[in-house]
Swiss-Prot record:
Domain Glutamine amidotransferase type-1: from-to ranges: 291-546
Miscellaneous remark of the record: CTPSs have evolved a hybrid strategy for distinguishing between UTP and CTP. The overlapping regions of the product feedback inhibitory and substrate sites recognize a common feature in both compounds, the triphosphate moiety. To differentiate isosteric substrate and product pyrimidine rings, an additional pocket far from the expected kinase/ligase catalytic site, specifically recognizes the cytosine and ribose portions of the product inhibitor.
UniProt-listed Enzyme Commission number(s): 6.3.4.2
Active-site residues per Swiss-Prot or TrEMBL entry: C380 (nucleophile), H519, E521
CDD domains hit by this protein: CTPS_N, GATase1_CTP_Synthase
GO biological process, one term: 'de novo' CTP biosynthetic process
Name used for this protein in its record: CTP synthase
Length: 547
């Protein structure tokens, strides 16, 4: 039976609950325990799949096709444990499930209420898989006091009450602000946050204090006294240069020991943190630097491409090189020469995205990389842009484009070399889609197998002829243009097992030019960099040595 750790936040949002949860999971793993991490989000969207990246950041996709919060990416990167659909839930999903049950008559005519029906649905979610691991770490989104979060706080209060004593603990993350006028760290916001938490029946066992300044011993003692928490369980959470320092930093502060003490686990197994020491060594002792241009649409918010930024960092670790990723808005050169914007970069990456805005700039970026022999990695839409560029400028399909950008019914602006995907094979059955389907959850989602051409660059990078990668798309390159494009040098080196869906394209007569329909960044880890990103950065290093 799993022990449960509930991670909550107070004072302000975006303090780093997800990273704290991931770091704690990594520390418990380092002591020999098995873990699983979960995220409970109070928003009413069923999932983040239809939310704007500017609202929510990136959507992290699991192997089994769930569209989830980006925090699940942190969980996977820090622990190596693949997330599942059952590791993410929102108020929207909970209420949807409850209302479906009501319509079916499952509640036998009873009046449906937040308590007990909604809270019971949340508790049922928490119980899934509780026999599989030693620790279940559950992060509650938002902050204590948010009205939309109240059913979740009530549910975890009940859940802990239902479990045997010592089976559940609560970790609360708050802000310790520094007031420059008085030269002091202020503890009052933390005291009020804990007071709010206790008012709904939850007493924190461990406090994490986010601070940009060293926390004096007297302030820790004060917080311990007023918040009724052991002094040893008042843990500093300082600002760090890199998120990958978090496991070592939290261990130095005693977080993992405080959690084990709260559970009464003694003596605790000693941690083996060698791989995190190696990660930090590779980051801090990089032997060079490469500049990578990320030509995208959502460049104002780095969280929109969070996994890509982290995967590039991992690729740098694999090559003991610092990767300086620079975000460039593709709209800047939709109608002009991209050279002034892209000169001086050692590699170019065009990530996934939706909609027509900025696509001509991405196509120009792919052309620049192809003609200037600059390493190019196109992901999802980035692969489609590379194919459209090759179709226009090499295969002489001058009006090549995507069905995604032909908005007017009956009026075609482009010859669609990229089309709306209407059916594909998933497991042993065929999935069918129509243009007028709902937007949410209707894409080709999750892990799919691809067959690689023996002797191709990608087969050499993967050291395999069959791979499995995660997808999130509803448009696909039209395989009918394969012969024309391959005749111009753009090879289709990865295909779906049935040979119908192009998964990877590459240019042989180029230092490094690869487009992939899937999202390799979602499977990269600091201690296991994704092979595509590792080799992409290696190619950038080669270019940097020629400059």
């Amino acid at each position: 039976m799993a022990r449960y750790v509930f991670i909550t936040g107070g004072v302000v949002s975006s303090l780093g609950k997800g990273l704290a949860s991931a770091a704690l999971g990594a520390l418990l793993q380092a002591r020999g325990f098995s873990v699983r991490l979960r995220k409970l989000d109070p928003y009413l969207n069923v999932d983040p799949g239809t939310m704007s990246p500017f609202e929510h950041g990136e959507v992290f996709v699991t192997d089994d096709g769930a569209e989830t919060d980006l925090d699940l990416g942190h969980y996977e990167r820090f622990t190596g444990v693949s997330a599942r659909k059952t590791d993410s839930v929102s108020s929207g999903r909970i209420y949807s499930n409850v209302l479906e049950k009501e319509r079916r008559g499952d509640y036998l005519g009873k009046t449906i209420q937040v308590i007990p029906h909604v809270t019971n649905e949340i508790k049922d979610f928490l119980r899934v898989g509780e026999d599989e691991v030693d620790f279940m770490l559950c992060e509650i989104g938002g902050t204590v006091g948010d009205i939309e979060g109240l059913p979740f706080f009530e549910a975890i209060r009940q859940f802990a009450q239902d479990k045997p004593r010592g089976q559940c603990i609560f970790v609360h993350l708050t802000l310790l602000p520094y007031v420059s006028a008085s030269g002091e760290l202020k503890t009052k916001p933390t005291q009020h946050s804990v007071k709010e938490l206790r008012s709904i029946g939850i007493a924190p066992d461990v406090l994490l204090l986010r601070s940009e300044r060293a926390i004096p011993e007297k302030e820790r003692e004060k917080i311990a006294l007023f918040c009724n928490v052991r002094k040893e369980a008042v843990i500093a959470a300082y600002d760090l240069k890199t998120i990958y320092e978090a496991p070592l930093a939290y261990h130095r502060e005693g977080l993992d020991q405080a959690v084990l003490d709260a559970f009464g686990i003694s003596p605790a197994p000693k941690p083996n943190l060698d791989r995190w020491v190696d990660v930090m060594d590779r980051l801090e002792n990089a032997e060079g630097e490469v500049r990578v241009a990320i030509v995208g649409k959502y460049t104002q918010l780095e969280d929109a491409y969070k996994s890509i930024a982290e995967a590039l960092t991992h690729g740098g670790m694999a090559n003991r090189t610092r990767v300086r990723a620079e975000w460039i808005n593709a709209e800047l050169f939709e109608r002009e020469d991209p050279s002034p914007f892209l000169e001086g970069f050692h590699a170019i990456l065009v990530p996934g995205g939706f909609g027509e805005r900025g696509t001509e700039g991405k196509i120009r970026a792919a052309q620049y990389a192809r003609e200037k022999a600059i390493p190019y990695l196109g992901i999802c839409l980035g692969m489609q842009m590379a194919v459209i560029e090759a179709a226009r400028n090499l295969a002489q399909v001058k009006d090549a484009g995507s069905e995604e950008f032909d908005h007017e019914v009956g009026k075609k602006r482009f010859t669609p070399v990229v089309y709306h995907l209407k059916e594909w094979i998933q497991g042993n059955h065929i999935v069918e889609r129509k243009h007028d389907d709902d937007k949410g959850g209707t894409m080709r989602l999750g892990a799919y197998t691809a067959a690689l051409t023996p002797g191709s660059r990608v087969s050499e990078i993967y050291h395999a002829t069959e791979i499995e990668e995660r997808h999130r798309h509803r448009y696909e390159v039209d395989v009918r243009y394969r012969e024309a494009l391959e005749g111009c040098g753009l090879t289709f080196s990865g295909m779906s097992p049935d040979g119908r869906l192009p998964e990877i394209v590459e240019i042989k007569d180029h230092p490094w030019f690869i487009g992939v329909q899937f999202h390799p960044e979602l499977k990269s880890k600091p201690f296991a960099p994704h092979p595509l990103f590792a080799d992409f950065v290696r190619a950038a290093v080669e270019v940097s040595r020629l400059v």
